[in-house]
Regions:
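Hydrophobic transmembrane alpha-helices and immediately adjacent juxtamembrane helices
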Residues: 1-263
Length: 263
């Protein structure tokens, strides 16, 4: 594994972001708008609802955590789409880069994009709504890491589809997370779901992460045993995602679709 090659690919995408104000604004705009929107919705419920006392803090914190998942997955996909749109996809795989080096570079670049988008939104929540996600303390890192891993895994799935089917698979990149959101039990407990959907939801790491988030915020206690299933599922999906990425690359290379990508 060559660190210089991975660093070179990282720099390529980093300078694309750094040299383009619209790209930076795009990274900041959506999470900021989402946090502000959900902040006002949460504030409404905190005034007019007796469901639980800390409605604002719970819903807004869950919204921020969901955006970690959303940003990480979309950022990974965007890096792949950038290569397609700039017609650099073929050059990427002609370059003396191993697939694992490409994956690792994209993972770290996606992390930078995610943080650029989320940090301003997180900072705004405290003066606007009196909510700070940082009050979660160390458990925040555990929750963040799990959501980031799952986001990257979804990115691997979508990127595999882009390699296999080309730009026509692009719509899946934008819709995949919205399809999972209702089953992820982000803003409500799993008990709300019908029995059939509960079975599916239990196979998603999101359910365990957001359930424990609500537990921490409501009871002030953290139970790491409740988070373990999320990490076990993440491990299974990540291994499968990496395997699918390699398989899609091999099939695309055999069929020659990598050459025509982006044309």
């Amino acid at each position: 594994m060559n660190l210089n090659k991975m660093y070179g690919l990282f720099l390529r995408h980093f300078y694309l972001i750094k040299s383009s104000l619209p790209r930076v604004l795009d990274l900041i705009y959506w999470p900021t708008i989402q946090i502000i929107l959900w902040g006002f919705i949460s504030k409404f419920f905190s005034i007019y609802s007796d469901y639980y006392n800390n409605t604002l803090g719970i819903i807004l914190t869950c919204a921020i955590l969901y955006d970690i998942l959303f940003r990480s997955s979309i950022s990974f996909n965007m890096l792949f789409l950038e290569e397609i749109w700039s017609r650099n996809f073929t050059n990427l795989f002609i370059a003396p880069l191993k697939l694992k080096e490409i994956i690792i570079s994209l993972i770290f670049t996606a992390l930078i994009r995610t943080l650029i988008g989320l940090v301003p939104a997180i900072i705004l929540t405290s003066p606007l709504f009196g909510v700070s996600i940082l009050k979660l303390g160390f458990p925040l890192f555990i929750l963040f890491l799990s959501l980031y891993i799952f986001g990257i895994t979804l990115g691997l799935f979508v990127s595999s589809g882009l390699m296999r089917y080309g730009p026509s698979f692009e719509n899946i990149a934008w819709s995949s997370l919205f399809l999972l959101a209702p089953l992820g039990c982000i803003y409500y407990p799993i008990e709300i779901l019908p029995e059939f959907f509960k079975v599916i939801a239990k196979g998603l790491p999101l359910v365990y992460i957001f359930d424990e988030t609500r537990n921490i915020l409501i009871n002030g206690l953290v139970d790491y045993e409740n988070i373990k299933p999320a990490y076990l599922l993440n491990l299974v999906y990540l291994i499968f995602g990496i395997g699918l990425f390699y398989l899609s690359f091999l099939r695309a290379r055999i069929k020659g679709t990598l050459i025509n990508m982006g044309e």
